[in-house]
Amino acid sequence: MNNKLNISLLLLFIFGCDEPTYQTQKSTTSQPEFDDIQYIEGDLIQINNYFGLIDSVNNHLFMSIGLNEISNFTGNIKYPENYAITIKDDFIYSNQNYDFGNIILGEPIPIKILKNDTIINDYDLIFTNLSTISVSTLDSILDDPKVFSEILINDIENDKAYQMFAGIEIRGGTSQWYPKKSYDLEFWDDSSGIETRKESLFGLRNDDDWHLDAMFIDLSRSRGILGMDTWSSFARSHHLSNESEAQLAQRGHLVELILNKQYAGIYSMNEQLDRKQLKLKIGSGLLYKTTSWSDEILFLGIDSEPGASLYWEGYELKYPDLAMVENWAPIYNLVNLVAYSNDEDFLNNIESLIDVDNAIDYWLFINAIQANDNGGKNMFIYRYEIGNPLAFTAWDLDLTFGNKNTVWTVDVSDERIISNNLYDRLFELNVNNYRSRVKTRWEQIYSNNLYSNIVYRLNEKINKINISGANTRENNRWDLEIDYNQKLQYITSWLEIRLDYFDNYIFENF
């Protein structure tokens, strides 16, 4: 969408027919339109490229701004005809430039919206250096199916604003019970949802499918993407030589979310980890997701044979979306070999079933950051194409970097080494000099400024949160007392101790 959004189009959305319907060649059913949501007039205010996003519960009008603009900021103000606004009691014409002076992020600036000389809305204008998103729905948001919504996005990275339709649903398993929910978004070309719409947001991939991660049990609001960044920095996979644009991890961008006119807090807007992200071959690639703990997940045994289903003993078939028994053959054969083969069979066959270099990197990764929930569950296992071995990548990395904020991790020792039966057998049988390969690879990774690079990325993320004022808003919204500087210090200290311990562990055991 053009970043200079057309005001007349916005007026049509807001002040159009009383009972609008949207007709397409594929559907004659009445569809919801933007004005069904009945946007408060404040959402039509634009400053430069960005929409003002309304939090009507707290009477806040959020506006994104780049850090390079906050000194002596002059903004071009736009709003529809038949309205008027004042900023600090100064009357502002539409399309007028207004001198805000030096912007203090998070500090309220009084703004009033008038119609027929009557004040209809009285807000505090809040500038933030984070990208901002507003999602408004007609219906309650469910786990499934996606419900119709309209969405406004202020994208700081691209200096663009977007207005579009989207389907939204609650995401996750256990996390669905948290008060702060995660969501899946699918951008739609129109209100019917028949055709999707791709956008390249925040310098990330061009796609229609996005994940809003609430990061609720991670009190640093940083660990998930920090872990993904770390994995991406050194992960190997056999197919990367053929697919230079493949990403072995999600990438994400910190945003502030307003959901149905109420501030919802700090989120990470993430790419999906799927066939497209990994650049697996259409038609011959395979992608499995591990969703729950089982003997099969840990390569310990097989309780049942896979059937014509998308699910098998803790695994979910994500691609292809075809419930066929033969799609389970590669992962079944791997579990069967690891769990039941004698040593000779294991030595002779394991390297034809898995990408051992990738497996080495994955084991080093989950132990470097102590990913306590990713040694079996919370993995993706993929095949690039027929004839290629399986490889591993991670997702859902909130229980990492010393996160003890759950009943599952509160008592976990910081010296725990994560493994499963696959890694145990690789080590015990020393497959093709596995131990020396692990040691050599770790020396390469650790000596390449691993600690300082992670700390640098963590500082970037925490500083963005603190500078924006979102730290206070997040605490107020969810009745928390998070000290983000304390979280920064904790993770930094924890990581230094963990990496030193793990380095000694490798030296002594490999």
Language-model segments: which ranges?
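Beta-rich interaction/scaffold domains
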Residues: 18-130
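Sec-dependent signal peptide recognition
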Residues: 2-10
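C-terminal motif of bacterial Sec signal peptides marking the signal peptidase cleavage site
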Residues: 14-16
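Middle-to-C-terminal accessory/interaction subdomains
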Residues: 164-166, 174, 178-179, 322-376, ...
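Internal "kinase-insert"/substrate-recognition segments embedded within catalytic cores
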Residues: 186-194, 198-217, 221, 233-238, ...
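Short, flexible loop/turn elements at secondary-structure junctions
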Residues: 137-139, 155-157, 170-172, 187-189, ...
